Amino acid sequence: MSFWVPNSAKLYLPPPTPVTQFLDTDEFVTRTDIFYHTSTDRLLFVGHPYFRPKKRRHRCCSQMSGSQFRVFRLKFPDPNKFSFPTQDIYNPEKQRLVWAVRGIEICRGQPLGVGVTGHPSFNKFKDAENLNQNSDQKEDDRVNVCMDPKQVQLFIVGCVPCDGEHWDKAQACEPQGPGDCPPIELKNTKIQDGEMCDTGFGNMNFAALQASKSGAPLDIVDQIVKYPDFLKMGNDPYGNSMFFYAKREQMYVRHLWARAGRVGDDIPTGESGSPYFLPATGRGPLPSSVYIGSPSGSLVSSDQQIYNRPFWIQRAQGSNNGMCWNNELFVTAVDSTRGTNFSISVHTTDPEVKPQETYTATKFKHYLRHVEEWDLSLIMQLCIVNLTPESIAYLHNMNESIIENWNLGFIQPPNDIEDHYRFITSLATRCPKKTDTQVKEDPYKDLKFWDVDLTEKFTTNLNQHSLVRKFLFQIGRKATKRSAPKTVTFENTEGKKAPKRRRKNV
């Protein structure tokens, strides 16, 4: 019997170097039954919702918008330096301790409210939805426009900063002329605290791609708007940037407008006419074909909130099942459903308004402020890392600082006596070498986060926290029983007759 086979000229060989094997943390990490609870203080922030105002040539406050990313960098204590009541928890010679996050609750204060944004010189020519006739453009058709931004609620939990994506101006292959549209490319950067999320106008570098400074609201017109790169973080082989996430977005278009100015990409026409429209006699040039929609986040409701409720991590989406390497955790959050802007009015001359004074608009100054209130609570589980050659090599390839912080290096004792200057930075001594002033470098020193120190806020008293009681109920455990209060019993005399008294004979 004969069979037809395809051309066998191609021969597939395995790669010359072995493929890197990515381990799952459950393969070399053992979980214990020891849990800790930690929580932050009440975290408050006040600022201007649109920009950083100047007062006497100084920045009086920061920009604070409900559509900004809040990136919390939570720093935990080193569990390898803990003093445990028993010595059989782990073997320091063959094992190391690490934290694993098992539960988290992100709480928001302040009432629900819709934030507004806008621009006093917004490029909105005319409504394009219900237009009776075309109007002629003028030199300046910008108007004052206000709108409510896209409604966003999301948070991402991981042990490294969250990855973001945005579109930015790219390098052109050929020299461009004035007025040509620049090429754009997708860039991936880390999301920092205070950066803007998408408000309905897209994720791009508005500072570089909006030369008119009138095509976006004030809070993003000079900013880089980012969006979390869920595709990249979901395919991360180590799974450190995103253990899990929760997201809720909502938006609809309220108005349809057209841009004023010259259209960069004209509607194509040919010798036989245009396939897109039929020309008319006596009609002027076509109106603008650059259309935009004004976003609106619509109704905010407490029925669709992802905050102020606990989340339990039974299985992470990546290979890292909640292990907080280097004793830190990053929480990236956005909540535009509490975006109310405070309007504060102050009299220009008098500290207090007189009762008999009449209202005059020029006598009052008006200010805008936005406030935020956060509170984070976590349940941490103590885990043991077995120091096998495979696990050490895997962690070293992922992040060598993990091994350095565990002090696993073998240092040979010096044979010769060494010199140590007391004041090495003094001008009377030699210039200090790099080894003399060696300081541990922060890998995220150029990034901006909201640092929260929790090194002294871990507790094993689990009865005092509602989050822990909910967690213990989920896993089928009970908290430590409290001693029963002392009870006092009283004899019930109801229904009993009083004893008769004997009469004495006189």
Curated annotation (Swiss-Prot):
Keywords: Capsid protein, Disulfide bond, Host nucleus, Host-virus interaction, Late protein, T=7 icosahedral capsid protein, Viral attachment to host cell, Viral penetration into host cytoplasm, Virion, Virus endocytosis by host, Virus entry into host cell
Gene Ontology annotations of biological process type: endocytosis involved in viral entry into host cell; virion attachment to host cell
Location within or outside the cell: Virion; Host nucleus
Record has Disulfide bond as a keyword: yes
One MF term in the entry's GO annotations: structural molecule activity
Gene Ontology CC annotation, any one: T=7 icosahedral viral capsid
General function of this protein: Forms an icosahedral capsid with a T=7 symmetry and a 50 nm diameter. The capsid is composed of 72 pentamers linked to each other by disulfide bonds and associated with L2 proteins. Binds to heparan sulfate proteoglycans on cell surface of basal layer keratinocytes to provide initial virion attachment. This binding mediates a conformational change in the virus capsid that facilitates efficient infection. The virion enters the host cell via endocytosis. During virus trafficking, L1 protein dissociates from the viral DNA and the genomic DNA is released to the host nucleus.
Family the UniProt entry places it in: Belongs to the papillomaviridae L1 protein family.
Assembly and oligomerization: Self-assembles into homopentamers. The capsid has an icosahedral symmetry and consists of 72 capsomers, with each capsomer being a pentamer of L1. Interacts with the minor capsid protein L2; this interaction is necessary for viral genome encapsidation. Interacts with protein E2; this interaction enhances E2-dependent replication and transcription activation.
Protein name: Major capsid protein L1
Source organism of this protein record: Bos taurus papillomavirus 4 (Bovine papillomavirus 4)
Gene: L1
